[in-house]
């Protein structure tokens, strides 16, 4: 029985004589339609087409192979019915040489068949990414050296580029800009023409009108989105004022101001918009009545103030300069942009020479060479098909393009030039909602242009057909996807209006499941609350952890990922425990879910996938993660790279500590602390040299390290890097060592890959260890991660963990999309020079002589456009993720404060059917979008109730189930599960009597209680604050609060990004200033103010931090007798870290005597101490507010902490601490101990 095609599918299969654009939604059977159309052409009784007369272009090699297989299967099926049909049998033979391929492979065929037209060596090969990156680095180094050596006007322009964009220390930033821009330009069909046209946009003539430029148009669009957000916020305030007694005057004033703001949305002209916004004034509000609600008055007044500030900011940022001044700014950018374009062209020439010498081409060359072969440029600059292109036009009866939404401009140019014009013969199929390869320069506007211009009418030369019936997913999945995207996807963000025409229509046929079975069900939303903000503030304030290092931040992130992974693992186990069933088309029946039916999708897999893999595996769930990343994060590679860095320069503390701690030298943690205490002012390397003079075991280890390092440094001078690297593997024994580690085979393979990279490096003109380390660092950034070896096959019965991008084109019965709270990556917006295929170059305006820089108005326009396109892509990525699900969709995400987030989502959904573009633009994660879209749904009432949000309920066919998780509870639950009684498990087994004695022995051993069990639970390390908490457990912390009161009034959503500093951050700023002040300079109010300004200039403080520092209180300290004594001392130390060893019984008083020799490392930071003739004076600063009459209680509370500081200080210095003080900034009190 043949396939039942819908009318739209039949139309796509049978229509002839037109260019056809098939807009095919997820799960609409587009591949089946494409294959059927090919079969239909081959078997057409009147005008049959041989398979080798068709060009079928797919996005990946895998897709090409699948297409070829499907065509073969279809042909064989027809041959079974018509075994005598020789022509059909011949098609199977022709299929092997049919052009069913990727665009790159097709272009490569064009180049190989016509190499003589390019003066190209026929034996050329394609260089891999590493090889071509090395050549690019080599070419850029040589080019820069040549430019520095020049003595003409080109050098002047180049030096201006270096001064403006080169960076503070060297020209590395400019090299990065050059390589990044070159990569972008090479993705365009005509790079040189694009550069020339772009540079000419800066060559403004006297008649240039900025107000009608494309840049002004984009900025106006962005401002209208901003204004709409401001307007919505004002309307919320207006709504709150309705029927408020005593605030009638406020109500009318707010209405009037909201109306003035609303009028801005009607202007499409720069000058009209400018005139209106400059005319907006916020007059003094009338007095409120005596019966006015003070809370409402305060809330709306605060909203109005924020709106005023925002309008003022827009005026100053965009409309403080006249259009003439803007024109002068653009004109001033012309010479430097021209110099940049010239540099790109010179680099292109040099890079081509390098490739020619090596006999290689890169992937971009393939497409450009093909375009060069297929086109001829006439005298007027028009592009015409060459003879080769005309040959292909004659050869191919029809050109098929799959995944058309992912085409880029050069690919479109190539396919257009070989396509026929009369009759048209292009068949393009794709879904613009699934265009997710912008980072590869895929351009969805190519699809849009045709989608908007092609007709739905049959018989037209250019026709479009819409396939929006989804044959993949259950109705619950489809309804939920439609509900989300009708709320958030628009023409501006997502670049598609998610209308009735675009939405998914249910087309799958799922049989009725067995009675009492668990199938399908509501879409699940799992929200995990991470550690609350208040807890974080308390910890930061008390522990003064203002210099939280990178490793700690990494640990926090890993913790958050672990929690999500554990929630996912728990849900997967529940699916199996409840015998969740899926429909299997192969057996035409329901069956219990398998692991292979489940996929976990992540936006980024580099840090996330390894954690998910480990957690699922520990939970007994077989899993597979083909991340393609993680190479540089593996222990063995990090260790060896650290070792190379140390051999090159041992003065680097972090790599040196990594090497010392590694199995290569095996220093213990205690020994490293001992080393640090040798001399707190010197580097670790200098401390090792000092320690090598000792006669103890540490001295021996230090001497061995220095001798070994010297030996390696001598060999590194004359040995090639690859040989030296292999020598290190063998001399350290590390290559053999990793083989004995878990996944040892893979680890050795990773080390061999590094060796291969070293061999490639040695083939260039670069030499030496220093340059190799730089190359590896550039490889991390420029080429991404290299990926580590695979061990488990993805075809096994495992849960797959993969990126959303890799899942495209696939489908799974159960889809779990995790990491939805992860913030969007916006780093592209902060480059010094932005670029856009339509808007050109957007540079920072730099006056290096005056040392000032700011974003040019051109950059502001491009920045907004890139942000818009980036978020549109993120929305399409989310769409791809959700549409992978066939039967069950589970969404998982974390948030710092769920109640706060729910209130934010409610504000975004409160005034309109669709979430506003402003709120979408200001969403920080997928969770923000999903939350705002679904928060009004009737099924989310429990979540609204939890957050105390009152919102009108919305009816919708979609079904939702919300589950809240707490990070702490998830971690505790995991620990509890890990401690399940093994003996109880043994008891549940049906053991033969034969094994009873053996069983008893097992039980005895498993029930053995270690006599020093408490020692197993003692921490190895505690902070001073933690010790204080343990020893002061009976003290109730209610007498101190922060000086810096946190704002409790609700802030409008559009201003949430400007929250101001938290209480902890303000205290941190005070400590930082006290640490960095130059005590030899003027410490008057003006002097302190000047030093703080200098700290901002040197980026020690941010401007926001500087504003929060109370210079009067700092001056007040230095006017005290204690402050004056400190200034008189010749030896003042500030922010001194320390470690001391305490007996566990000093901290845990209830431990018995046998624990006397169990030690705990205590660590902390001493704010300040200074030396006088008869000893040391210790000072600890506090920024707490102390309630009246509670000073003595505060003094008592911090007694333990001060004693520990004193003890540590005496251990470190060997000198007596004669006096100990706490200084309270709030009231200037000095507490002496």
Curated annotation (Swiss-Prot):
Binding positions for ATP per the UniProt entry: 24-31
NCBIfam families to which the protein is assigned, alphabetical: addA_Gpos (TIGR02785)
Keywords: ATP-binding, DNA damage, DNA repair, DNA-binding, Exonuclease, Helicase, Hydrolase, Isomerase, Nuclease, Nucleotide-binding
Lineage: Bacteria, Bacillati, Bacillota, Clostridia, Thermoanaerobacterales
Catalysed conversion reaction: Couples ATP hydrolysis with the unwinding of duplex DNA by translocating in the 3'-5' direction; ATP + H2O = ADP + phosphate + H(+)
UniProt gene name: addA
Gene Ontology terms, MF aspect: 3'-5' DNA helicase activity; 3'-5' exonuclease activity; ATP binding; ATP hydrolysis activity; double-stranded DNA binding
EC number(s) reported in the record: 3.1.-.-, 5.6.2.4
Description of how the protein assembles with itself and partners: Heterodimer of AddA and AddB/RexB.
Protein name according to UniProt: ATP-dependent helicase/nuclease subunit A
PANTHER family noted in UniProt: ATP-DEPENDENT HELICASE_NUCLEASE SUBUNIT A (PTHR11070:SF48), UVRD / RECB / PCRA DNA HELICASE FAMILY MEMBER (PTHR11070)
Protein family (similarity comment): Belongs to the helicase family. AddA subfamily.
UvrD-like helicase C-terminal domain span: 518-809
Superkingdom of this protein's organism: Bacteria
InterPro entries listed in its UniProt record: AddA (IPR014152), DNA_helicase_UvrD-like_C (IPR014017), DNA_helicase_UvrD/REP (IPR000212), P-loop_NTPase (IPR027417), PDDEXK-like_dom_sf (IPR011604), PDDEXK_AddAB-type (IPR038726), Restrct_endonuc-II-like (IPR011335), UvrD-like_ATP-bd (IPR014016)
Function: The heterodimer acts as both an ATP-dependent DNA helicase and an ATP-dependent, dual-direction single-stranded exonuclease. Recognizes the chi site generating a DNA molecule suitable for the initiation of homologous recombination. The AddA nuclease domain is required for chi fragment generation; this subunit has the helicase and 3' -> 5' nuclease activities.
One of the record's GO cellular component terms: DNA helicase complex
Organism expressing this protein natively: Thermoanaerobacter pseudethanolicus (strain ATCC 33223 / 39E) (Clostridium thermohydrosulfuricum)
Coiled coil: none
Domain UvrD-like helicase ATP-binding intervals: 3-474
Signal peptide segment: none
Cross-referenced PROSITE patterns: UVRD_HELICASE_ATP_BIND, UVRD_HELICASE_CTER
Single biological process term from Gene Ontology: double-strand break repair via homologous recombination
